[in-house]
């Protein structure tokens, strides 16, 4: 009976997402509607869809698990970097990008860069699209894998079957409703994620014996409640959290300036003046959600201390919220429905990221590669068909990549984050705020940043020591330096480009 209630809750949730896609399926008249919702999104939807698509399953799985095992330092510094990055992205980039992209009639990030620099050969379009595809496909695969593992661990459902079902639902509402459906479902999913965090937190504190007991337990563990050390659960010791560690975790915030699926939200809002409200909503939600996520890890350890939960070692710590949901479900039908809602929250965290990534990748293939770089003349219907076909193809490849339930596909998430931040971040900032930046500089910056991610990750980082820093930071700096230097040693932009730059101020 308990499993039936949980499954019914999740099924109702998934069917609801498909209905949203169906409702918006008739509102996509052209590619601008499909990719950007016709630039008609309100401030609440813009804010919450951006943050829901940002906060993938790591918010409900990775971050609580990390806090559970190591204390508050690593997740805490990461959260600070992400919170500051979120706020700066909304404050600095959002309004300028909305105005500039609307002036140029750009509907994708690569297209914006191409039009910004009058790239007649569409090299920026092609390079940007390739980068998006290279990093988004495995990123999407990790989302499918999360869904498959969730159903498999809870109900014993075949991993592959569960993953395919999840992919079908995500692909279904995305290809039907496009950006409007994705943004609306992301808003709904952010609410579900919030409810899941609150329910787990309240229940966990109660089972652990109260907040004072949770804090006393955390204080008794070496290095657990300090931002200057990390707790080692294996031998109950503390390890110093170095400046290098802090720099690596804070560097996550730089990734926001280059995230295509987040930048698209800025481009889609109906009125740039409403971005102020969106920024406030997004920033507050991010801080509260990440704080709750870290505290859940601490509370989970308190539950283990109280004997309500077995000790979760290694990667099993990421199933903390799933384990708590299972405990909640034991308290009757209503509790089982609540547990189903919590598990739907994990699905929501995964789906809200995967749908946005697939839409961004589809726009890159249909708009940037086929039409602009490949010079294919497509009607609006043909363009939308190409985008929808691309989404299906990406999902198939993603399912194939994640077909092994023991695969390490989750490891690609931080690498993909670095890939986007290193490739696009500095170039987007230069294109928006530096008039002297030119096509050659943007191309060189994007290419060097993307390559540095691979070089640092696989060649330099294994050397250890100071070289063990997160690859996003050196890639971002390399891209910035190369973009500036190449722009300065090559011809200045034309008067027309400079006039367009001034018009977007």
PLM ranges: what are they?
Residues 1-505:
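Membrane-embedded helix-loop-helix hairpins and adjacent transmembrane boundary segments
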